[in-house]
Amino acid sequence: MQLGVIGLGRMGRIVVDRVLDAGHEVVAFDLSAEAVAAAADAGAEPADSVADLVDRLGDDKRIWLMVPAGDAVDATLDDLDPHLDGDDVVVDGGNSHFEESVRRAEACSAAYLDCGTSGGPAGAELGFSLMVGGPQWAYDELTPVFDAVATGPDGHGHMGDSGSGHYVKMVHNGVEYALMQAYGEGFELLAEGRYDLDLESVAKTWNNGAVIRSWLLELCEEAFREEGSDLGDVDDHVAGGSTGTWTVQEALEQEVPVPLIYQSLAERFGSRADDRFSRRLANRLRYGFGRHEVARKDD
């Protein structure tokens, strides 16, 4: 299969590499000529514009967007749409709001798949978890690509109609917030409690057979190993928050109580005002799973 990939940042480059490794062809474009050259060195066919990328694809075009959510998606679609028809498929693999994905699907000349992507930079080796919404036929058509980009056939699923993939990913991120908050509070109690504990050792022990073992807990272990049990100079300012806000807003609209997700979001916003150990751990965990910049106390 031939796939066009637009957006060659951390996540987009992983898509390119995994699709190439699976034996498919990739045509790659990014606003950064350096990123395009690097993808070409890895085996992708370089394109110097969106129009050039489209010209290099066959009649039934399959195009994966991995650009920042918001205006960048709309701008890219504006460039693409004149070249597309109903036999083509476009995948938005970014963190778009599900309602925006529904709007784009209705306006796009091609079949439009909204694909929630989870796994962070670790997906380069392990593969991603992919939550896909949109036409069933388009999902089926892209299955070989999803198999390559995901952890395997069980690492992706068709969630339903347009918007459902990004909807499920939105809720996934809300759950992620709550899990980070729970781990943060637990380790804060251990750090401030009555025993002098090696928190790396605690996390390592929990990761081997405990009910609460998880990849996030493995990242806690990594954080304590690299920063120390007191987290060193890691600040308690936790960035992000948009997808958690969307989750809480949707819960209010659907009249579904989500107190844990709401409280974790409130703590994240509160991190811009005072200092707590739990938020410092959340700050460091965001580096672990997404390689987001770690705010330091002397920054």
UniProtKB/Swiss-Prot annotation:
Reactions it catalyzes: 6-phospho-D-gluconate + NAD(+) = D-ribulose 5-phosphate + CO2 + NADH
Entry superkingdom: Archaea
NCBIfam families from the UniProt entry: gnd_rel, PRK09599.1
Pathway(s) the chain acts in: Carbohydrate degradation; pentose phosphate pathway
One of the protein's GO biological processes: D-gluconate metabolic process
PANTHER family: 6-PHOSPHOGLUCONATE DEHYDROGENASE
Positions bound to substrate: 95, 118, 120, 172-173, 177, 268
Enzyme class, spelled out: oxidoreductase
Biological function: Catalyzes the oxidative decarboxylation of 6-phosphogluconate to ribulose 5-phosphate and CO(2), with concomitant reduction of NAD to NADH.
Gene of this entry: gndA
Gene inactivation effect: Deletion mutants do not grow on glucose.
Amino acids binding NAD(+): 7-12, 67-69, 95
Family: Belongs to the 6-phosphogluconate dehydrogenase family.
Name assigned to this protein: 6-phosphogluconate dehydrogenase, NAD(+)-dependent, decarboxylating
Gene Ontology molecular function terms on file: NAD+ binding; NADP binding; phosphogluconate dehydrogenase (decarboxylating) activity
Keyword set, alphabetical order: Gluconate utilization, NAD, Oxidoreductase
Upper taxonomic lineage: Archaea, Methanobacteriati, Methanobacteriota, Stenosarchaea group, Halobacteria
pH dependence (UniProt free text): Optimum pH is 10.5.
Description of how the protein assembles with itself and partners: Homotetramer.
Catalytic residues identified in the record: 169, 176
E.C. number: 1.1.1.343
